[in-house]
Swiss-Prot record:
UniProt-annotated binding residues for Ca(2+): Y55, G57, G59, D76
Active-site residues, Swiss-Prot/TrEMBL: H75, D121
Pfam family name, one: Phospholip_A2_1
Oligomeric and partner information: Heterodimer; disulfide-linked. The A chains have phospholipase A2 activity and the B chains show homology with the basic protease inhibitors. The A1 chain is found in beta-1 and beta-2 bungarotoxins.
Subcellular localization: Secreted
Cofactor remark from the record: Binds 1 Ca(2+) ion.
InterPro entries documented for this protein: PLipase_A2 (IPR001211), PLipase_A2_Asp_AS (IPR033112), PLipase_A2_dom (IPR016090), PLipase_A2_dom_sf (IPR036444), PLipase_A2_His_AS (IPR033113)
UniProt name for this protein: Basic phospholipase A2 beta-bungarotoxin A1 chain
Propeptide: 20-27
Disulfide bonding pattern of the chain: C54-C146, C56-C72, C71-C127, C78-C120, C88-C113, C106-C118
Keywords tagged on the record: Calcium, Disulfide bond, Hydrolase, Lipid degradation, Lipid metabolism, Metal-binding, Neurotoxin, Presynaptic neurotoxin, Secreted, Signal, Toxin
EC number assigned by the record: 3.1.1.4
Amino acid sequence: MNPAHLLVLSAVCVSLLGAANIPPHPLNLINFMEMIRYTIPCEKTWGEYADYGCYCGAGGSGRPIDALDRCCYVHDNCYGDAEKKHKCNPKTQSYSYKLTKRTIICYGAAGTCGRIVCDCDRTAALCFGNSEYIEGHKNIDTARFCQ
């Protein structure tokens, strides 16, 4: 074998070994973001929902402060059920869906992790689209309002 080819092959193998230790990206979050963009008013971005109320974003505690925050509360619980009851990993679970006629269709057999997680995301995204966004509930003091 040509020494140059051997060197390239060795570099590829080392790269692949290193990649095996990289944790998976939360790919379904990309799907969830696309669903949210599809259902919310045009003047909003999905990022404006990332730190809203007590439950939209990482973690959550206390009582939801409004209907939109309740959407996130229900979504968090849906993911929790998917993990506990069905042994799914919602943050890395891939799934198939279609955005059509102002609704979202999830594909896959009922009861499979992909379908369960898609249904969680679908329900939350549609809820976002039907709930009022209150500017004063963005970036709230969670230590004060979410007990």
